[in-house]
């Protein structure tokens, strides 16, 4: 009688390598599909995490009215809620070159303007045309003899200064924003500004931060008022030395 014995078989190393490779390809592909389909949700979640941990970073600009400073940080928390807001370009991209407005037109993936592109950049998401117009009026480098298409520095301090000067120009808004803020009419101010920054509410592009903005403003205002008080005390102490 012929007896058959089972032969112990060992896995083929080449076959195992091929299986691992195929599995990795499948996992990478699935990951890309998941990320693409959930990119906006992931972005919103990350914004909430950053906001809860860091709030809205202090301004680079020193001085100025604390009520307006708090408003500027509130605009930033809705428009550019990232770790380095001054360097942000629309879509969550970053630029290292702030010698001038980045002027990169990034495709808009969702919302009513889908299919168009946006040049919004910096902490306050200035469009290139808006930056040029407002820099001509409010940038420290501006002058009556400056040509209209002059390339103004987009460094962080100038982003702050241009916006501060714009917000405090009553003629630009036909309202006294500082007085409204001191009367705690922040909702009225946000509505006034919403045609310019639509994420502030009352517009067409609310985001996860929009409904929290009045509360965010009041929190930031308390920080700015405290900082101003500390600065005044320090100055007083220096004068008494």
Regions found by a protein language model. Name each.
Residues 13-16, 76:
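Hydrophobic transmembrane-helix microenvironments that flank and shape a buried ionizable site
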Residues 20-149, 162-175, 179-241:
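Cell-wall polysaccharide-cleaving catalytic domain and substrate-binding groove, primarily
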Residues 151-155:
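A short, structured beta-strand-centered segment in the mid-to-C-terminal lobe
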Residues 1-14:
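N-terminal Lys/Arg-rich, disordered targeting/topogenic segments
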Residues 159:
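Hydrophobic (often cysteine-bearing) scaffold residues that line and stabilize catalytic clefts
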